[in-house]
Amino acid sequence: MVKRADAGAIVAQLRVAIAPDDIAITLHHKLCHAARQLLEQTLPAIKHGNILEIAQRENEATCFGRRTPDDSFLEWHKPASVLHNMVRAVADPWPSAFSYVGNQKFTVWSSRVHPHASKAQPGSVISIAPLLIACGDGALEIVTGQAGDGITMQGSQLAQTLGLVQGSRLNSQPACTARRRTRVLILGVNGFIGNHLTERLLREDHYEVYGLDIGSDAISRFLNHPHFHFVEGDISIHSEWIEYHVKKCDVVLPLVAIATPIEYTRNPLRVFELDFEENLRIIRYCVKYRKRIIFPSTSEVYGMCSDKYFDEDHSNLIVGPVNKPRWIYSVSKQLLDRVIWAYGEKEGLQFTLFRPFNWMGPRLDNLNAARIGSSRAITQLILNLVEGSPIKLIDGGKQKRCFTDIRDGIEALYRIIENAGNRCDGEIINIGNPENEASIEELGKMLLASFEKHPLRHHFPPFAGFRVVESSSYYGKGYQDVEHRKPSIRNAHRCLDWEPKIDMQETIDETLDFFLRTVDLTDKPS
């Protein structure tokens, strides 16, 4: 036996079919019957030591947390099939699914999917008899339901009781609920993740974003937004402003960090001071004021782990010797992960750690940073193409990474902030795309192909070829590389109902297009 739920070896299994008409109570009876069968077969074998243990795939094992009322909201923008299955899952003996008409709560006890119903705004009443509600895809018929604490009745009777007519709108919360906007503090708001996350949050009407950074070029498009509040400054100087806003806000994302590999060997102490010491102070503010922190860990913490898939809960975190300063970023982040975890365990800090795996897209660094070598891979490669200099393949460019589109990454991060059912509390979540695995050499070739067919191609010099260079000559003697880095995204799927969707080629095309259109073409050949 092991202490974790749904972990350890399998000693007995029995498949239980879920029929289309099953609800929570009927499935419960099926599972009880199956459990009785298994115990009758297995307990004697355990007693006599005759069991055969089968190792399970730990990265596929799942468990679901305690049910909360949030699990029963009927969110009408979702597909009808999803809502129907939710009604089945939380029906008798549970309190069942619910929604509101104005301030009147009503419960749905049974439902039916109408996949080909006429299109209407999600949450709109399409018809009264049957009581048909438009969803994000298809429509849901409310077969039986209950108004408030009343009796269970047929859908058409429920519509009459609630005063519904064709075109009425349902909602997931009481209409009179005036919800204060959630205040989100983003330190490093002008950075790659910060500016894209700000855009996603401001797309909704229930977030107020407070940001600090040393520049504002990437967020200039938000500066006049009524729900965006920005101060230009350095986190090492503006400590009083930061403490005040940690106290004021609901969610804190300290995104400030030096995260470019060449800086790990070039300026290891600066990496430690900013990435560790400054962030530790912010973490302690969150503990002091009991604020939720969403902390950017990194895929770098896995280091030279040899697992096929890097798993948040099981993979070992392996780094090189002390005389390789390349690892100072990885261990700084790892120690902060452990500090946050300890504060959560011992002092009740509400936290989520997320680990990005090679996110890329528009506004990833800039070409000026790439000119001094202080940028991530794709931006450096684009600069080589723009300037007509050889693309440098460090140690042959055979290192493999899983590249993730910034839009996929931000959607996952947005869902962490939303934290439906508090499922993200105390979790470590990899955010990456295992399907987009490619070597740096392959990335370079895909980028080159996209560059050659770009409409602005004629403004730039001829391709200067690939050049293999040693990592020690490029990064310095304190560098070590990682051969592969592929995430398990089991936790992201379980906690966020998320999986990446965007193909790597699409990301490359859009990133290249963004940077080429930032280049001053007045001095370029035409």
Swiss-Prot record:
User: Which residue stretches belong to region Dehydrogenase ArnADH?
Assistant: 180-526
User: Per the record, what are the reactions this protein catalyses?
Assistant: UDP-alpha-D-glucuronate + NAD(+) = UDP-beta-L-threo-pentopyranos-4-ulose + CO2 + NADH; UDP-4-amino-4-deoxy-beta-L-arabinose + (6R)-10-formyltetrahydrofolate = UDP-4-deoxy-4-formamido-beta-L-arabinose + (6S)-5,6,7,8-tetrahydrofolate + H(+)
Q: Name one GO cellular component term.
A: membrane
Instruction: Detail which positions bind NAD(+).
Output: 213, 234-235
Ranges for the region named Formyltransferase ArnAFT are 1-170
Is the Lipid biosynthesis keyword given for this protein?
yes
Query: Keywords in UniProt for this one?
Result: Antibiotic resistance, Lipid A biosynthesis, Lipid biosynthesis, Lipid metabolism, Lipopolysaccharide biosynthesis, Multifunctional enzyme, NAD, Oxidoreductase, Transferase
Q: Name residues in a coiled coil.
A: none
Query: What does the entry list as the binding residues for (6R)-10-formyltetrahydrofolate?
Result: 2-6
Q: In which pathway does it act?
A: Nucleotide-sugar biosynthesis; UDP-4-deoxy-4-formamido-beta-L-arabinose biosynthesis; UDP-4-deoxy-4-formamido-beta-L-arabinose from UDP-alpha-D-glucuronate: step 1/3; Nucleotide-sugar biosynthesis; UDP-4-deoxy-4-formamido-beta-L-arabinose biosynthesis; UDP-4-deoxy-4-formamido-beta-L-arabinose from UDP-alpha-D-glucuronate: step 3/3; Bacterial outer membrane biogenesis; lipopolysaccharide biosynthesis
Instruction: Identify the catalytic residues.
Output: 300, 485
Instruction: Please give the Gene Ontology molecular function terms for this protein.
Output: carboxy-lyase activity; UDP-4-amino-4-deoxy-L-arabinose formyltransferase activity; UDP-glucuronate dehydrogenase activity
GO terms, biological process: lipid A biosynthetic process; lipopolysaccharide biosynthetic process; response to antibiotic
User: Under which EC number(s) is this enzyme classified?
Assistant: 2.1.2.13, 1.1.1.305
Q: Does the keyword Acyltransferase apply?
A: no
Q: Where is this site: Raises pKa of active site His?
A: 6
Q: What Pfam families does the entry give?
A: Epimerase (PF01370), Formyl_trans_C (PF02911)
Binding-site list for UDP-alpha-D-glucuronate: 259, 264, 298-299, 326, 358, 392-401, 479
InterPro entries listed in its UniProt record? Arna-like_SDR_e (IPR045869), Epimerase_deHydtase (IPR001509), Formyl_trans_C (IPR005793), Formyl_transf_N_sf (IPR036477), Formyl_transferase-like_C_sf (IPR011034), Lipid_A_modif_metabolic_enz (IPR050177), NAD(P)-bd_dom_sf (IPR036291)
The entry describes its oligomerization and partners as: Homohexamer, formed by a dimer of trimers.
Instruction: Give the protein family.
Output: In the N-terminal section; belongs to the Fmt family. UDP-L-Ara4N formyltransferase subfamily.
What the protein does comes down to: Bifunctional enzyme that catalyzes the oxidative decarboxylation of UDP-glucuronic acid (UDP-GlcUA) to UDP-4-keto-arabinose (UDP-Ara4O) and the addition of a formyl group to UDP-4-amino-4-deoxy-L-arabinose (UDP-L-Ara4N) to form UDP-L-4-formamido-arabinose (UDP-L-Ara4FN). The modified arabinose is attached to lipid A and is required for resistance to polymyxin and cationic antimicrobial peptides.
The record's PANTHER family line, in alphabetical order, gives:
BIFUNCTIONAL POLYMYXIN RESISTANCE PROTEIN ARNA (PTHR43245), UDP-D-APIOSE_UDP-D-XYLOSE SYNTHASE 2 (PTHR43245:SF13)
Protein's name in the database: Putative bifunctional polymyxin resistance protein ArnA
Q: Which organism is it from?
A: Shigella boydii serotype 18 (strain CDC 3083-94 / BS512)
Encoding gene (name): arnA
